[in-house]
Design a protein with these regions (language model features):
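The catalytic Nudix box helix
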Residues: 19-54
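Hydrophobic pocket/interface hotspot
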Residues: 6, 34, 38, 88
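Hydrophobic pocket-lining residues within nucleotide cofactor-binding pockets
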Residues: 24, 57, 73, 85, ...
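Active-site segment of metal-dependent pyrophosphate-handling enzymes
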Residues: 43-77
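Nudix hydrolase/Nudix homology domain
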Residues: 12-16, 62, 68, 78-125
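N-terminal strand-loop-strand
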Residues: 1-19
Length: 125
């Protein structure tokens, strides 16, 4: 019951810890984009036991949107990182790395989302 975090290499957020992520392609569903980004960023697509939406964020000007999902998998694995990330760590709930990407920090500091994560963890055996 641990979470995979990836350490970013881009100059704007270098060293910050985040999650697998990226933009969907034209006419690509959110789920297909999710599977593609997982494969691109960690080198393989583990079998998804469950995919649970955590947050659907839209900026005030409606120009920026992102979805955050929790993907439950059977077993932890050794990620094969692409150039977007320089490191990874598997962390227990609320024991995540200190230097979180600002957007992820906001997400994980949201009481409602933390409650949802805890509920899901309690249900996953």
């Amino acid at each position: 019951k641990r979470f995979l975090f990836l350490q970013r290499t881009d100059s704007k957020t270098k060293g910050a810890w985040g999650l697998v992520g990226g933009m969907t392609k034209y006419n690509e569903s959110a789920f297909d984009g999710l599977k593609r980004e997982v494969e691109e960023e960690v080198g393989k697509t583990p079998s998804f036991k469950k995919v649970i939406p955590l947050e659907l964020f839209t900026s005030n000007d409606q120009k920026f949107k992102f979805n955050t999902y929790l993907i439950a998998i059977e077993n932890e694995f050794l990620p094969k990182l692409n150039g977007e990330h320089s490191g990874y760590c598997w962390c227990a709930f609320e024991c995540w790395p200190k230097n979180l990407h600002a957007g992820l920090k906001n997400t994980l500091n949201n009481k409602s989302i933390r409650g949802k994560l805890q509920t899901v963890l309690d249900l996953i055996v």
